[in-house]
């Protein structure tokens, strides 16, 4: 019994040492620059004061806001409003957090934060969001 316990401890220590020595799969997997296009739809088409809060997210460590004032919608199409932003330094982060908010935090579109976890290999990424729907399309 004692020998078996020692073997398990040795195996655990070996695996723990190996896992600390290697970066996670997400580390460095993102492109350095992401060109993000967000399409946003509100049922009543009431877009006044709505904007995006984006941040470069680390699972461990410090996050980094993309803009301290939020990202404004600057265009529109048949779906709704469009915002386009170029985000640099994404290769040092795990994913991109996104909140659709009204004004300076008067309200949020959905209660939970959304996270963009997949980006085009060239950094070009396009998503669609709907009012009150937490899914990223």
Model regions: which residues?
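Bacterial N-terminal signal peptides that target proteins for export
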Residues: 2-12
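Small-side-chain structural scaffolding
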Residues: 10, 26-29
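C-terminal segment of classical bacterial N-terminal signal peptides
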Residues: 18-27
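The feature marks proteins involved in alpha-glucan
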Residues: 29-44, 81-137
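Aromatic-rich carbohydrate-binding modules that target alpha-glucans
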Residues: 46-91, 104-111
């Amino acid at each position: 019994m004692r020998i078996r316990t020692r073997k398990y401890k040795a195996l655990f220590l070996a695996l723990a040492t190996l896992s600390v020595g290697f970066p996670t799969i997400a580390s460095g997997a993102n492109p350095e620059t992401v060109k993000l296009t967000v399409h946003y739809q509100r049922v009543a088409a009431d877009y006044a004061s709505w904007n995006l809060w984006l941040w470069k997210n680390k699972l461990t460590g410090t996050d980094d806001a993309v803009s301290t004032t939020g990202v404004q919608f600057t265009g529109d199409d048949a779906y709704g409003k469009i915002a386009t932003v170029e985000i640099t330094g994404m290769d040092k982060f795990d994913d991109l957090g996104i909140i659709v908010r009204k004004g300076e935090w008067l309200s949020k579109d959905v209660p939970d934060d959304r996270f963009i976890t997949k980006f085009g290999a060239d950094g070009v990424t396009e998503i669609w969001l709907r009012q009150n729907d937490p899914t990223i399309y």
